[in-house]
């Protein structure tokens, strides 16, 4: 072991090993696919509580709602939605 070495394998040695690519050939596409499905099915909207793109405005409106009172914003928006 060289002086000052932490005992870890060099990065180049890791990424050129077959074991690294066998593991990552499965995990990287799986992570991408899981993220794609999470967003495309709409589960991301439900998990984070954000409105879906078609729920930002009512059908009769064409601009964003303006809140005039800082601490009464939720009640103002609730009144608009009814």
Curated annotation (Swiss-Prot):
Its main location: membrane. The keyword Oxidoreductase does not apply. One of its GO terms (cellular component) is photosystem II. It is a single-pass membrane protein. It is found in: Cellular thylakoid membrane. The chain crosses the membrane at residues 22-36. Keywords: Electron transport, Heme, Iron, Membrane, Metal-binding, Photosynthesis, Photosystem II, Thylakoid, Transmembrane, Transmembrane helix, Transport. With its partner (PsbF) binds heme. PSII binds additional chlorophylls, carotenoids and specific lipids. Heterodimer of an alpha subunit and a beta subunit. PSII is composed of 1 copy each of membrane proteins PsbA, PsbB, PsbC, PsbD, PsbE, PsbF, PsbH, PsbI, PsbJ, PsbK, PsbL, PsbM, PsbT, PsbX, PsbY, PsbZ, Psb30/Ycf12, peripheral proteins PsbO, CyanoQ (PsbQ), PsbU, PsbV and a large number of cofactors. It forms dimeric complexes. This b-type cytochrome is tightly associated with the reaction center of photosystem II (PSII). PSII is a light-driven water:plastoquinone oxidoreductase that uses light energy to abstract electrons from H(2)O, generating O(2) and a proton gradient subsequently used for ATP formation. It consists of a core antenna complex that captures photons, and an electron transfer chain that converts photonic excitation into a charge separation. This is Cytochrome b559 subunit alpha. It comes from Synechococcus sp. (strain WH7803).
């Amino acid at each position: 072991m060289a002086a000052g070495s932490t005992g870890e394998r060099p990065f180049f040695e890791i990424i050129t090993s077959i074991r690294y690519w066998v593991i990552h050939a499965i995990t990287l596409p799986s992570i991408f696919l899981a993220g794609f499905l999470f967003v495309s099915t709409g589960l991301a909207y439900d998990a984070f509580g954000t409105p879906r793109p078609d729920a930002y405005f009512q059908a009769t409106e064409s601009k964003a709602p303006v809140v005039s009172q800082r601490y009464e914003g939720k009640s103002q928006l609730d009144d608009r939605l009814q």
